[in-house]
Amino acid sequence: MKFALLSGVAAGLLPVVSAVSVSGAAEGFAKGVTGGGSAAAVYPTTTDELVSYLGDSSPRVIVLDRTFDFTGTEGTTTATGCAPWGTAAACQLAINQNDWCTNYQPDAPSVSVTYDNAGILGITVASDKTILGSGSSGVIKGKGLRIVSGASNIIIQNIAITDLNPKYVWGGDAITLNDADMVWIDHVTTARIGRQHLVLGNDADNRVTVSNSYFNGVSDYSATCDGYAYWGIYFAGSSDLITFKGNYIHHFSGRSPKVQENTLLHAVNNYWYDSTGHAFEIGAGGYVLAEGNVFQNIDTPVQSPIEGQLFTSPDTNTNTVCATYLGRNCEVNGFGSSGTFSQADTAFLVNFEGKNIASASPYADAQSSVPSSAGQGNL
């Protein structure tokens, strides 16, 4: 479907007052997640206190009512890195993490890099946690979140994660999952991130729902040297079920998302806006059902070649196949000034049978609502 460009689509988010309790419930694969449940809310006031609450063994509801700035809390490092994309002011440089420059960019010029240590590794989040922002006040600056090593039953809602060494590749990921289960990420904003805004690592991440979140790729530095972040969203787990619904993915030049290994992704009612490169990158083992989404000013909705499988819900007749596996027909996607998105692989749709499936609305609903409703402060 084609539609005209909406005026003001990139307008600022509309702040609203939110209560310090979970709003709504997870749809899709993470349906039933409870986080900290009925635990009494705690309000950390320092970065140390926040780290302690997130990582302890008690069920907790942790309310963020201020900015927790980790910048400088772990010192800085000056080392030799590299410049794979040149040394122009808008180009990201790379930290030589795990000898990445040495092994993968041997011809890149060497450069001196100085980065903030806090951004490199996120805060560990243990099981049975709810992390809630109060209004638009809950911000974690300079450090991400890390849900790993069997952690499960976690809700992250209405917070922002910002400013993780944006000048440097390997400068840090906003949210990392690896060997996790039952995680709901909702109404989260990420901005100015050195590496991935969201990454699901190589171990199984099982049941995850990412909803109503704003991935903001506007940056002074990027791998494409044009102000469009390249490192967006990376789904590469060994047995992952991901519902990705109602999200606003804005101003990226690639990897938004990259899907591979053994990942079943249901991308529904999202809004991709303004990309100089590609949105989806689908490697071997990536299985993507995309329906009811909006692609506006996206040069390449999916990068070629597609090594996994993709069902793009191309038309109402073809979309009736979804009824067998989802219990309803799929919704067509909408396009404005965007490239081709038309593949219709169906063999993998059987993997949706018997699972919790998110509902879908016509793409026009996402077109009108997602830019102003996604992200922090919009519960």
UniProtKB/Swiss-Prot annotation:
One of its GO terms (molecular function) is pectin lyase activity. It is an enzyme of class 4 (lyase). Coiled coil: none annotated. It comes from the Eukaryota. It catalyses: Eliminative cleavage of (1->4)-alpha-D-galacturonan methyl ester to give oligosaccharides with 4-deoxy-6-O-methyl-alpha-D-galact-4-enuronosyl groups at their non-reducing ends. The active site is at R255. GO terms for biological process: cell wall organization; pectin catabolic process. It is found in: Secreted. The keyword Cell wall biogenesis/degradation applies. Keywords: Carbohydrate metabolism, Cell wall biogenesis/degradation, Disulfide bond, Lyase, Polysaccharide degradation, Secreted, Signal. The keyword Oxidoreductase does not apply. One of its GO terms (cellular component) is extracellular region. Residues 1-19 form the signal peptide. Disulfide bonds join C82-C101, C91-C225, C322-C330. Its EC number is 4.2.2.10. InterPro entries: Pec_lyase (IPR002022), Pectin_lyas_fold (IPR012334), Pectin_lyase_fold/virulence (IPR011050), PEL (IPR045032). Gene3D superfamilies: Single-stranded right-handed beta-helix, Pectin lyase-like (2.160.20.10). Belongs to the polysaccharide lyase 1 family. Pectinolytic enzymes consist of four classes of enzymes: pectin lyase, polygalacturonase, pectin methylesterase and rhamnogalacturonase. Among pectinolytic enzymes, pectin lyase is the most important in depolymerization of pectin, since it cleaves internal glycosidic bonds of highly methylated pectins. This is Probable pectin lyase A. It comes from Aspergillus oryzae (strain ATCC 42149 / RIB 40) (Yellow koji mold). The lineage of its organism: Eukaryota, Fungi, Dikarya, Ascomycota, Pezizomycotina. The gene is pelA.
